[in-house]
Amino acid sequence: MGDDALTADSGRDETQSLSPFRYFTAAEWGRLRQDTPLPLSQGELEELKGFGERISLDEVSEIYLPLSRLLNLYVGETQELYRVTSDFLGREQDKVPYIIGVAGSVAVGKSTTARILRTLLARWPNHPKVDLITTDGFLYPNKVLEERGLMQRKGFPESFDIKRLLRFLSDVKAGSRHVEAPVYSHFTYDILPGETIPVDYPDILVVEGLNVLQPWKPADGDEPQPFVSDFFDFSIYLDADEASIRRWYIERFLSLRRTSFKDPAAYFHRYSKLTEEEAVETADAIWTSINLANLRKNILPTRQRADLILRKGDDHRIRDVLLRKL
């Protein structure tokens, strides 16, 4: 090994010693799966992938299988803590779900990550019950957003019914046997009235959303509120360069323009009539005025609050893993 390589390794070791995170390349992280088998087929992966998402079974095996192994260990230790606490108190304690938060920008792949984790965690030998909800369901309905002049701020913190989300998480953490989360439709771009997702006393709940790691500021006159992340036992941030996320967003917009936007009932049907050039300009304008602004102001600043950062390269593949030191 040459002097340059030694210097590079020394610099990396020094940086790691000062950072609150332990750094792994994808290959280093992948070795932590040990002999854990991959309980997922190619067909199942296709069903879990988000629209236009690029992910292979190799990446699932290298990144998500070791992560599911780590989380399974964490969940087991938490359940053991409840057992010994029950022994100490001399009475049975209610099981409390282990909550995992998944945060990151629009178009970075949060939904796919959340679905893969839910599936892998549910297939461990102890067969835990794993539920998944997205915070999109806690957006205010379009009617409310229009009344408040917030339609162009959709996805920003003020567009969410944060009190309802906090009540939901509080009920889950209190061990409520049945809790319901509202449902959001990307097709109609609105909350679906009367539709809910049941959360029935799971072992693990995965919560996916843009701003789930953000400290929420109470409105004037309101009492201080807990943060959404206060209810998390573990949190994950999906990271990538702005230029890459912008390109992925535009690519997804163009794909939707050729598919679901063509349905006359789709909220964004009008975009299906755009030329390719007009569609790129429109997607770029939406990205810059809404999604990039939200990323820079509200989402990216929360990255350091995560327990795990998954950093993607330009090809959408996870290249680096940063795990918070205990």
UniProtKB/Swiss-Prot annotation:
What biological process terms from GO does the record include?
coenzyme A biosynthetic process
An example of a GO molecular function for this protein is: ATP binding
Principal place where this protein is found? Answer: cytoplasm
| UniProt keyword list | ATP-binding, Coenzyme A biosynthesis, Cytoplasm, Kinase, Nucleotide-binding, Transferase
Q: Where in the cell is it found?
A: Cytoplasm
Q: Which SUPFAM superfamilies match?
A: P-loop containing nucleoside triphosphate hydrolases
Q: What is its EC number?
A: 2.7.1.33
Question: Is the keyword Transferase in the record?
Answer: yes
What is the main EC category here?
Answer: transferase
Q: Which Pfam families match?
A: PRK (PF00485)
Query: One GO CC annotation, please?
Result: cytoplasm
What catalytic activity does the UniProt entry give for this protein?
A: (R)-pantothenate + ATP = (R)-4'-phosphopantothenate + ADP + H(+)
The biological pathway it contributes to is: Cofactor biosynthesis; coenzyme A biosynthesis; CoA from (R)-pantothenate: step 1/5
List residues binding ATP.
Answer: 104-111
CDD domains in the record: PanK
Family that this chain belongs to: Belongs to the prokaryotic pantothenate kinase family.
Record-given protein name? Pantothenate kinase
